[in-house]
Amino acid sequence: MEAKQREYHFTKNAKAFTDMFSEDFLSINKGAINKPSRNNSYEMFDEYFKSTEFLKWDDNKAPVIRFSNDGSVAYVAVDKVVIVKMLNGNGKGIMDTANFAWLTVYKKYKNEWKIDCVTSTNK
């Protein structure tokens, strides 16, 4: 699923990316817990992807992957370097590099893994 997320960032496919989210999706970021609707998530990521060119979205370390005993829940902890060019209205871009660590919680719904929660930090 991490490979698909990377693909959707580079291809700017907000629809496919947010289709990975469960109906109960939670986002924990910048000291806040949010439960955005799928449509709100789509609109936010669509706008973000349209204004961003991803140059690098790579692991600094191998992801840590764990599963619940019954196999219905999993989590993946990642440490990534992300390099982007933020595009502005005049066609020029501003380069930005960030190191992110995040935890993605996956839950199985009708034999399909969905993203239930993402907790993200960056330095």
Segments predicted by a language model, with ranges:
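Beta-strand elements of well-folded, non-transmembrane domains
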Residues: 80-88, 106
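A solvent-exposed, acidic/Ser-Thr-rich amphipathic alpha-helical stretch
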Residues: 14-72, 77-79, 94-98
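Short beta-strand edge/turn micro-motifs at domain boundaries
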Residues: 97-123
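A short local loop/turn or secondary-structure capping micro-motif enriched for an aromatic residue
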Residues: 36, 75, 83-86, 123
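Short, aromatic-enriched amphipathic alpha-helices that serve as compact interaction elements
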Residues: 1-13, 20
